[in-house]
């Protein structure tokens, strides 16, 4: 079955899948079920000395609480198909529960990182329900015979010491800029407060500099040519906002002094005049500012965190 799929992909893309680099093995899990683990190596256009491999973990021993959602496979390149391929995925609330359970089991840096990224968006943008989220988590943990993770239990675990020492080693090479662990530890406490039903303050939305189109919704990815013919680096802005990191924004206003501003990123809005606007708090001026996206020349994500005073919508 796997080799048939590899042959079809190879015919459509030209990517080679050497048969000797395809390997699957069955392994028992702690509950007496079977997990199928495998790797599929491939040779693409870059021709690295060591061929990369795709890793698979397949199991029937898992409880699915929410109905899967059909989502398009993200493809940011120019050769993306007109009709993107779609696959069934966990909804966000179930992914968050999976990550929280994993945090209790192994406590790896990527688990903490994903919990905070998902919970920030889940609470503030997607409006996830805390009681429903806790119910999903309880059922996930019960399936594996695990206690519900708590902040105290996580910090008392030997895994936490390893997480602290491996934060930079395991995440630094995967991210444009590495957020400080302290900010994620602080937000983990907020997440568990929310999960327990405690009230968590909701920050106000930014004050707009000009009226925006209320019907506009930001796309999954933003690509926009600037007035100078180069792509405005808007995904860097999104990354900084989602990770609560300051930006060095190289901006060329229609009037005023061009140059680099240190900015807290908050939101994209689409003005009634037809401009995509980035709203950020200018640190030097201590005020929210609307920046036209097509006038942004460059973005550098710093490792300096900020504590939002408005709702981050990125």
Residue ranges and their predicted role:
Residues 49-83, 215-314:
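Core beta-strand-centered patch of the WYL/Sm-like small regulatory domain
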Residues 1-226, 312:
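Structured mid-to-C-terminal alpha-helical surface segments
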């Amino acid at each position: 079955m796997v080799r048939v799929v590899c042959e079809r992909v190879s015919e459509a893309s030209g990517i080679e899948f050497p048969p000797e680099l395809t390997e699957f093995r069955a392994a028992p899990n702690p509950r007496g079920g079977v997990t199928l683990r495998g790797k599929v190596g491939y040779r693409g256009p870059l021709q690295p000395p060591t061929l990369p491999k795709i890793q698979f973990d397949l199991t029937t021993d898992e409880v699915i609480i929410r109905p899967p959602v059909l989502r398009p496979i993200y493809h940011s390149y120019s050769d993306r198909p007109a009709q993107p391929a779609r696959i069934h995925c966990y909804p966000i609330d179930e992914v968050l529960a999976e990550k929280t359970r994993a945090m209790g089991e192994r406590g790896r840096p990527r688990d903490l990182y994903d919990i905070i990224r998902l919970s920030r968006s889940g609470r503030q943008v997607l409006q996830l329900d805390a009681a429903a989220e806790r119910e999903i988590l309880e059922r996930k943990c019960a399936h594996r015979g695990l206690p519900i993770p708590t902040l105290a239990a996580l910090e008392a675990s030997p895994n936490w010491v390893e997480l602290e020492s491996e934060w930079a080693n395991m995440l630094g090479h995967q991210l444009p800029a590495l957020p400080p662990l302290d900010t994620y530890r602080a937000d983990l406490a907020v997440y568990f407060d929310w999960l327990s039903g405690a009230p968590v303050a909701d920050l106000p939305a930014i004050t707009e500099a000009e009226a925006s189109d209320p019907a506009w919704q930001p796309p999954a990815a933003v690509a926009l040519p600037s007035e100078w013919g180069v792509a405005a680096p808007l995904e860097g802005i999104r990354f900084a906002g989602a990770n609560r990191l300051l930006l060095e924004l190289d901006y060329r206003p229609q009037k005023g002094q061009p140059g680099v501003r240190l900015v807290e990123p908050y939101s994209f809005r689409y003005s009634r005049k037809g401009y995509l606007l980035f709203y950020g708090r200018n640190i030097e001026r201590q005020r929210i500012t609307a920046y036209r996206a097509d006038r942004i020349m460059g973005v550098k994500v710093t490792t300096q965190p900020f504590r939002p005073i408005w709702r981050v919508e990125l």
